Amino acid sequence: VADGRSPALWRSPRTWLALGTAVLAGSALLVSGASSASAATGNNVNPEGILKYGVDLNDTFSNTFDPGASTDDCSYQVYSALYDSLLSAANTTVNPLLATSYTDTPSSITFHLRPGATFSNGDPVTAATVEASIDHIKTSPFRFSLTYIQSIQQVNPTTITFTLNKPVAGDVLLAMTYIDGMQLDPAALPTSSTVPASSGPFTLSSYQQGSSILLKANHTYWDKSAYKLGGVDFVQVSPGPQEVSALETGAVDMLPIQPEDYAAVKALPNVGIATTKSEDYLVMQTRQSGAPFNDPKVRAAMEYAVDRKGINNAVFSGLGQPAYQPFPSWTAGYNKAVGNKYTYQPAKAKAMLAASGHPHGVSFTLVIPSGSATFSRTAQILQAELAPAGFKMSIQQVSPTDLFTDVYEHGQGDAVLTEELTNGPDLANNFEGEYTGIGFAGRELGDTNATLTPLIDQALASLSPSVQGPLMRKAGAIAMATGTEVPLIFEPSVVAYNKDRVGGTVVAPIGECRSNLAGIYIKKG
């Protein structure tokens, strides 16, 4: 559920988009989560204005408009403009969307739907269409939170109840903010991959694979007053210097930026920057089904063999936050007893390796997606940092389009450099995907963990920080002590925009692979 959302508790092969959207803001940036492009006045709004939004479509879109067929969670940033979910996510809460309210117990959830909401073709959103949407999206292997829904009861046309097969209401609630909870018109399902019927603020106008996705305003949308754009053009911009150039030349009006481009973008006089803190983090996942990482003592040693602060400074220009544990300090999952314990101590790591029966060190292969400066630079630094501790790491680059099959299905590599996306208030969500039997990554990498699973299962019953916090603090401490993952950097969400063209209050989304289009507009003239 991450991203607030869903179950994608792992974020499927989202193709890692080279961190192209989130990594930037340090403490100075985090002072404000929004940036005022200009005061919103009716006289300055161009109701036909089209926002040109830069995105790497080649690496972050699944080439289908059917959420049930998506294999890349980064498609969410486009899908969320086309489809409303039942709920929406903030960093610490879930909020109404197509459901105006809900009541829940650990094993059931009842949603009250928004009266009068329709799809773009005029069909109403009802309990029947919600059930059909869930049944359709549930067929995806990536939407595993939906497998918790045992049965669905249509109480009346605007009320629907989910009965769950486990006490995991918190997890399912978050799933309802994400791809899992997106609402599709069952009458349009046969053509949804190419001609979707929208339940969101925009409809599809045209699509050129790898080039552009053009959307226009959905004039039947229930909350159309919140959206002042005539449309949105998602246009292809590859990560790297092209992002800076696209902003500078006006080829795009808005885009997420990479860490290495922050200084150049900030120097542009007509560009504004908006930031939002996020739980997104860069992480090394290890394959624990075989040597060397089937030994928890080897994994534990590696926690002291990486210089998180050094990576933050060298790769992220000091703008991220070193991840000494899986949860940032501003969340209920942060464990004060762990704190910043796992600093770079290569001599200690080497001694731990020797004590585990490896006096001459261990060798392993780290897989990274090709074509990403951020991942490439991070991997090279990791290679140098790990060597004094006795970890001999080789780097293998794989095309982003092949990562999913090569690494997770075919078992290539001993570890992979990837990214976990925010799950908003559902702190347990990523751990569910990584370490429980239901999680895709946990199954494919052999990382299921019998010690962590009971803590995760208990936490999934509720989104309350008082429930999840103590459990995930304990789980995080265990994860670090046994090296179940190697968190590296927390990455705030950052978007840049053309101040001459974009008006309203620009708010960066709560994490990568998202877009926030409400309240902004294109200026007249």
Language-model features, listed with the residues they occupy:
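Gly/Pro-rich hinge or "lid" segments in bacterial periplasmic/extracellular proteins
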Residues: 72, 92, 176-226, 231-233
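Structural transition elements
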Residues: 321-355, 372-375
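Alpha-helical secondary-structure segments
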Residues: 52, 126-132, 157-163, 200-201, ...
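Detector for C-terminal structural segments
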Residues: 208, 306-333, 374-383, 408-525
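Ligand-site clamp/hinge motif
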Residues: 220-265, 392
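Ligand/substrate-recognition segments at binding pockets and active sites
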Residues: 354-422, 465
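Surface-exposed binding/hinge segments that line
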Residues: 46, 103, 108-110, 144-186, ...
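N-terminal lobe/hinge region of extracytoplasmic solute-binding protein
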Residues: 54-106, 197-198
